[in-house]
Amino acid sequence: MRILLVEDETDLGMAIKKVLVSEKYVVDWVTDGSQAWDYLENQWTEYTLAIVDWLLPGLSGLELCQKLRTQGNSLPVLMLTALGEPENRVEGLDAGADDYLTKPFVMAELLARLRALQRRSPQFQPQILTLGNFSLDPSNNLLSVTISEPLNLERQEIALTVREFQIFQYLMQNPERIISGSKIRQQLWDLDEEPMSNVVAAQMRLIRRKLAQQNCPCPIKTVPGQGYRFTLSP
């Protein structure tokens, strides 16, 4: 899950991001409401949730929510604010926030509210992705491969790490499309991370090794000089 965090308090933003990353979220953190709107306007489909402070430079969190909803954007938003009066909460929710968390707060409550948003939103329900003989289960990071034998079907289950799962899923969602390593890094790593240029290749070696250990074919092919392609063709 990729989250857009919009928080101008440096210490708080760093603390929130650290906790979210430890929970396996991918986090893009910006400190300005106008910058956040640029991200959401141009690539909102890459995000599954936004955590937005109310008092921000540029656009306020309230204005950001209003712009989202005016455009019919249903991206779930958790509003953070030091304004804790009932009328403030009503104003935030009426502007389009899905939940409201008053500062100061403990991180456990923040995570609990994120989980609650996930339960309420159909788009967050884990959906098994299947293509050909390959199935991915987001609830447990499990890859299942069905191998056709002359007299029966054999099913192998392979446990992937979070990052391996993300790479396999991203390529599987874009079958027959060549995707560069830099594009994969841009999609799956945080904006302020600087992974080594060969990190995707290293992860691909691990994925292929796990498949080979189970005598399973790997549907991800390397296209020299261009990137990777998920294909069911031999």
UniProtKB/Swiss-Prot annotation:
- GO annotations of cellular component type: cytosol; protein-DNA complex
CDD domains reported for this sequence: REC_OmpR_CusR-like (cd19935), trans_reg_C (cd00383)
Report the residues modified as 4-aspartylphosphate: 53
Provide this UniProt record's keywords sorted from A to Z.
DNA-binding, Phosphoprotein, Transcription, Transcription regulation, Two-component regulatory system
Look up keyword Iron-sulfur and say if it applies.
Answer: no
Q: What GO biological process terms does the UniProt entry carry, in alphabetical order? A: regulation of DNA-templated transcription
Induction per UniProt is: Expression of the rrpa-rrpB (nrsR-nrsS) operon is induced 3-fold by Ni(2+) and less by Co(2+). Autoregulates its own expression.
| Listed Pfam families | Response_reg (PF00072), Trans_reg_C (PF00486)
Q: Effect of gene disruption?
A: Grows faster than wild-type photomixotrophically (in light with glucose), specific activity of photosystem II (PSII) is about 30% higher, most cells are single when 90% of wild-type are doublets. Increased transcription of most PSII genes under most conditions, transcription of PSI and phycobilisome-related genes are mostly decreased. A double rppA-rppB (nrsR-nrsS) deletion is less tolerant to growth on Ni(2+), no longer expresses nrsB (slr0793, involved in Ni(2+) resistance) in response to Ni(2+). Loss of expression of this operon.
What domain of life?
Bacteria
From the Swiss-Prot or TrEMBL record, what is one GO molecular function term? Answer: transcription cis-regulatory region binding
Locate the DNA-binding region by residue range: 126-232
Q: Specify the Response regulatory domain's residue ranges.
A: 2-118
Query: Is Lipid metabolism there in the keyword field?
Result: no
Q: How does it assemble?
A: Interacts with histidine kinase Hik2; may accept phosphate from Hik2.
Q: What is this protein's function?
A: Member of two-component regulatory system RppA/RppB, involved in the establishment of the appropriate stoichiometry between the 2 photosystems. It senses changes in the plastoquinone (PQ) redox poise. Another group shows this two-component pair, renamed NrsR/NrsS, controls the nickel-dependent expression of the nrsBACD operon; they suggest the photosystem-related activities seen earlier are due to the expression of NrsS (RppB) in the absence of its natural substrate NrsR (RppA). May accept phosphate from Hik2 in a possible Hik2/RppA two-component system.
Q: What is known of its domains?
A: The N-terminal response regulatory domain inhibits DNA-binding by the rest of the protein, in its absence the protein binds specifically to the nrsRS-nrsBACD (slr0793-slr0796) intergenic region.
Q: What is this protein called?
A: Response regulator RppA
